Amino acid sequence: MGLEKSFILFSLLVLVLGWVQPSLGVESRESSADKFKRQHMDPESPSKSSPTYCNQMMKRQGMTKGSCKPVNTFVHEPLEDVQAICSQGQVTCKNGRNNCHKSSSTLHITECRLKGSSKYPNCEYTTTDSQKHIIIACEGNPLVPVHYDDTV
């Protein structure tokens, strides 16, 4: 009888885990490289962003769920060009690690900054377009971007 109860409880546990696991969200299975692409790559946008670009993109790319991400940068260049930065000048990252690389040329970027008066869930951002060098952290073999470190 005890073995039968254990089997039933185990079966119920497996069933519950089967329901819970698919609802854990994309972020829990997202690789660092995929997260970098989601948070920072937007090669399709025109050279000049609209004033509401950041409000739309930050929400669309999942950076206003649970809280407002204070700062984010989108790169408007082909992914291959950004991946190529991983073989360019190596520099020290803000956190002291040595896996960062600085772009040899300027890239079209949009910087999104949370407005001072903005509070979750109504995240509002300022949108600033510019041409600047970027610094990204790269990992793996082959090296791929996994973190946006700075704009210079």
Swiss-Prot record:
The active site is at residues 40, 147. One of its GO terms (molecular function) is nucleic acid binding. Residues 1-25 form the signal peptide. It comes from the Eukaryota. Disulfide bonds join 54-112, 68-123, 86-138, 93-100. CDD domains: RNase_A_canonical. SMART domains: RNAse_Pc (SM00092). Residues 31-45 have a biased composition (Basic and acidic residues). It is an enzyme of class 4 (lyase). Keywords: Disulfide bond, Endonuclease, Hydrolase, Lyase, Nuclease, Secreted, Signal. It catalyses: an [RNA] containing cytidine + H2O = an [RNA]-3'-cytidine-3'-phosphate + a 5'-hydroxy-ribonucleotide-3'-[RNA]; an [RNA] containing uridine + H2O = an [RNA]-3'-uridine-3'-phosphate + a 5'-hydroxy-ribonucleotide-3'-[RNA]. Endonuclease that catalyzes the cleavage of RNA on the 3' side of pyrimidine nucleotides. Acts on single-stranded and double-stranded RNA. Belongs to the pancreatic ribonuclease family. PANTHER family: RIBONUCLEASE, RIBONUCLEASE PANCREATIC. Monomer. This is Ribonuclease pancreatic beta-type. The lineage of its organism: Eukaryota, Metazoa, Chordata, Craniata, Vertebrata.
